[in-house]
């Protein structure tokens, strides 16, 4: 029933100046009208508020009635009839007595025992406000329970001390009825009884279900002590001459000062507080009686029997009204608290610390090293502190920052604890004394109830509080491989526990592998992507996937293009693939412009597109690419393998084949004048070290049939015009090798004759070669750098930039000399 009304806000307004006859006699409940004050909840016609709205269901009406009567019972402090509990559930009865967690109940007793209280006070004196350490010392209480108990401990301590102070001054006078202040302008000396009057702030009722995982002790030993001395129905007030007539106004507001609302079980004990201000009306729903000297603050008299873990600490220092000033009773008078310095006083002189001893102030300021932790010990604190002091002695009078001391404090803890020690030493004047960079900031606000411990203790407490409030970083750990990672990443992993022998063996293996890797790293420094990889041959175990045939026209253009440049040349292969016969025919070659960087040769995208269109116009498909190795073996480099593999995989998606051809015209290891040609594909097999895929070379067959002569002449003219003025152009009239009498042009003609030997008529072949030779001689005469001497082929010109002799020691594109 109570759960259905849990989220219902009930606003009941009444006139506190009028009262009606009680109608509690007609209700079937344990509450009787003679138990309570005259109710302000009834209207002039004597109707109860739950009877005003006919739309309220019977169950909700009963719930509202029960809640209001229970609240009236709380405020009146009258004994409850026994029969009232007969109609109630046991769970509801327990909710009145205590707040029980819906998840689980605490195994420890609800009320704090004397032993626990003594341990709490002992831990408070030893650790300060480190609730985790105090909870560990007590053992039977959680950190949350210790924190809640501490909140009420300090609050009740202030109340008790303030009450004892005022009790000696003001005697045992009783407060007159609050309602009488409306009719009587003066306060008389005669004692009158203060009947229970509902706090107007309670007119707005909100019932919530607490969800704290603990049982909370709602008995307060301080209140029990006060109840033995004075009647809870009365309160002591000082004798004064006159009190200004104050109109008591009631304003119903709902304010959420915490996630859990206060419930009151006794009459509020109004705390007397000396102040010079007057309560502000109509701003906060507080009923205030103001005199020139004394102010009654009902908000300070709320019951402390309910723990509120989510209430902000500022509620302990300020009244619930944001406009009321200094309404908390402090153990230090106002003048002292207002005269506090905004900053910690800079030290007057440099402090000398004994390197072999730890002061009590240090233990209080940096307690983490003195709590018995395995990672943080007093010896480690001494090491860090003394190292910082030594560094200060070395760099004095220059400012010693935190970063400069960290390199010498490896494996001494995280940077945050080192920074806290550095900050502490700086604040007490042990380091950075007299430096302008030293900052003495005001620490965070602290609980002023510790003021009586002495001014020095308070300063030490402030310092410790500031050090503990420094931002901490996320803790990082190393994974099993020694890499830094977040601690959460290692959650749920299983760790292998090894013996000492196994650890030693693995350590040796690790050292060996490390040495091996260092040795191989020096070898791999010369292992660049231009290293040549020999091609493997197909065998019976690994047969060729298809046959490769090359036309005469393709070989003629390929030789022409490769012979004219010392740099690598590049182009596309055109032809067709016959799947039924598993034959790839290379029928045409399209030279392309290259983008050479000196280390590699790449195909110009525009030229590549034009070459593809030219092949397509002749009815051929792109079935591969070619490039030259001018003066070294026609083996692919690692980069060539990677490029070929990418193209190969791309074309294979459509079922096409893609070959790679490498031609070497001036390889000095080749004893024959004919160019070396390699036609290859890349397999899926990896090398022993896994750095590349193994290339395989095909056996080339030459196709029968005459080439298109005019097309070959057109390609020749394009090649000569492009490369004759190039800085990498080959001087065609020079010997291509020291041990040969052949010039580069003669070598080219010999290669072309070899290609045409079995396919064309000898007369036609001779005519074709003669025209090619004449065209080369005529074209190169136009260039002053390439003058031809027909009579003396062995004579060399000193102004020639590139000759074939330079190939003996030069490897293009940065390739190693083989």
Curated annotation (Swiss-Prot):
Keyword Metal-binding attributed: yes
InterPro entries per the UniProt record, alphabetical: Homeodomain-like_sf, JAMM/MPN+_dom, JAMM_MPN+_peptidase_M67A, MPN, Myb_dom, SANT/Myb, SANT_dom, SWIRM
Ranges for domain MPN: 548-680
JAMM motif, short sequence motif: residues: 627-640
SMART domains in the record: JAB_MPN, SANT
Protein location: Nucleus
Gene3D superfamilies according to UniProt: Cytidine Deaminase, domain 2, Homeodomain-like, Winged helix-like DNA-binding domain superfamily/Winged helix DNA-binding domain
EC number, UniProt record: 3.4.19.-
Origin: domain of life: Eukaryota
GO BP annotation list: chromatin remodeling; double-strand break repair; positive regulation of transcription by RNA polymerase II; proteolysis
SWIRM domain mapped to chain residues: 344-442
Coiled coil feature spans: none
PROSITE patterns for this protein: MPN, SANT, SWIRM
Annotated protein name in UniProt: Histone H2A deubiquitinase MYSM1
Native source species: Xenopus laevis
């Amino acid at each position: 029933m109570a759960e259905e009304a849990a989220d219902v806000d009930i606003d009941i307004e009444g006139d506190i100046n009028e009262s009606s006859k009680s109608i509690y006699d007609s209700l079937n409940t344990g509450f009787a009208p003679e138990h309570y004050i005259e109710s302000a909840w009834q209207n002039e016609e004597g109707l109860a508020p739950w009877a005003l709205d006919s739309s309220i269901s019977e169950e909700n009406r009963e719930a509202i009635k029960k809640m209001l009567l229970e609240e009236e019972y709380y405020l009146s402090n009258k004994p409850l009839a026994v029969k009232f509990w007969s109609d109630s559930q046991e769970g509801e009865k327990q909710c009145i007595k205590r707040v029980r967690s819906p998840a689980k109940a605490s195994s420890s007793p609800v009320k704090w025992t004397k032993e626990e209280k003594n341990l709490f006070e002992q831990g408070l004196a030893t650790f300060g406000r480190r609730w985790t350490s105090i909870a560990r010392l007590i053992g039977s209480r959680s950190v949350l329970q210790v924190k809640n108990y501490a909140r009420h401990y300090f609050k009740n301590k202030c109340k008790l001390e303030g009450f004892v102070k005022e009790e000696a001054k003001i005697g045992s006078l009783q407060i007159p009825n609050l309602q009488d202040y409306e009719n009587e302008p003066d306060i008389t000396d005669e004692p009158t009884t203060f009947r229970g009057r509902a706090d107007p702030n309670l007119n707005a009722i909100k019932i919530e279900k607490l969800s704290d995982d603990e049982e909370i002790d709602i008995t307060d030993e301080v209140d029990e002590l006060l109840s033995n001395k004075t009647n809870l129905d009365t309160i002591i007030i000082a004798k004064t001459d006159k009190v200004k007539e104050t109109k008591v106004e009631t304003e119903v507001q709902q304010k959420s000062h915490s996630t859990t609302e206060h419930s009151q079980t006794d009459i509020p004990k109004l705390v007397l507080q000396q102040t010079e201000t007057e309560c502000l009306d109509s701003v906060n729903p507080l009923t205030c009686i103001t005199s020139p000297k004394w102010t009654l603050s009902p908000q300070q008299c709320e019951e402390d029997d309910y723990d509120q873990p989510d209430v902000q600490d500022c509620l302990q220092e300020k009244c619930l009204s944001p406009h009321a000033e200094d309404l908390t009773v402090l153990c230090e008078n106002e003048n002292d608290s207002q005269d506090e310095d905004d900053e910690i006083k800079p030290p007057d002189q440099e402090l000398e610390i004994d390197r072999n001893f730890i002061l009590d102030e240090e233990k209080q300021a940096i307690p983490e090293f003195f709590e018995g932790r395995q990672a943080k010990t007093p010896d480690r604190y001494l090491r860090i502190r003394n190292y910082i002091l030594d560094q200060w002695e070395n760099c004095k009078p220059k400012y010693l920052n935190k970063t400069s001391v960290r390199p010498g404090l490896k494996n001494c803890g995280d940077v945050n604890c080192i920074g806290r020690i550095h900050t502490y030493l700086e604040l007490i004047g042990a380091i950075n004394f007299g430096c302008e960079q030293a900052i003495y900031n005001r620490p965070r606000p602290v609980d002023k109830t510790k003021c009586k411990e002495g001014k020095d203790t308070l300063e030490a407490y402030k310092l410790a509080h500031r050090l503990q409030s420094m931002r901490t970083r996320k803790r990082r750990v190393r994974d099993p491989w020694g890499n830094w990672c977040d601690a959460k990443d290692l959650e749920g992993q299983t760790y292998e526990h090894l013996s000492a022998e196994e650890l030693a063996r693995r350590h040796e293996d690790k050292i060996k592998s490390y040495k091996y890797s260092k040795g191989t790293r020096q070898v791999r420094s010369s292992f660049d992507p231009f290293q040549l990889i020999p091609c493997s041959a197909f065998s019976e175990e690994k047969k060729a996937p298809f046959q490769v045939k090359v036309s005469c026209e393709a070989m003629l253009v390929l030789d022409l293009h490769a012979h004219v440049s010392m740099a690598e040349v590049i182009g596309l292969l055109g032809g067709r693939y016959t799947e039924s016969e598993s034959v790839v025919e290379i029928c045409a070659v399209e030279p392309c412009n290259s983008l050479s960087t000196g280390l590699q040769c790449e195909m110009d995208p525009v030229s590549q597109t034009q070459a593809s269109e030219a092949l397509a116009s002749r009815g051929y498909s792109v079935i591969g690419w070619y490039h030259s190795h001018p003066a070294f073996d026609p083996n692919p480099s690692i980069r060539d393998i990677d490029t070929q593999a990418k193209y190969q995989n791309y074309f294979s998606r459509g079922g096409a084949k893609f070959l790679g051809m490498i031609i070497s015209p001036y390889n000095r290891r080749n004893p024959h004048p004919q160019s070396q040609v390699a036609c290859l594909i890349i397999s899926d097999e990896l090398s022993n070290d896994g750095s590349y895929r193994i290339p395989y070379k095909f056996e080339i067959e030459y196709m029968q049939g005459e080439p298109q002569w005019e097309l070959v002449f057109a390609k020749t003219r394009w090649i000569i015009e492009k490369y004759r003025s190039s800085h990498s152009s080959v001087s065609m009239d020079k010997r291509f090798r020291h041990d040969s009498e052949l010039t580069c042009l003669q070598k080219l003609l010999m290669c072309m004759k070899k290609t045409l030997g079995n396919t064309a008529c000898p007369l036609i072949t001779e005519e074709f070669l003669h025209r090619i030779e004449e065209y080369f001689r005529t074209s190169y005469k136009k260039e002053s750098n390439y003058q031809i001497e027909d009579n003396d082929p062995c004579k060399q010109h000193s102004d020639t930039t590139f000759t074939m002799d330079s190939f003996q020691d030069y490897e293009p594109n940065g390739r190693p000399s083989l």
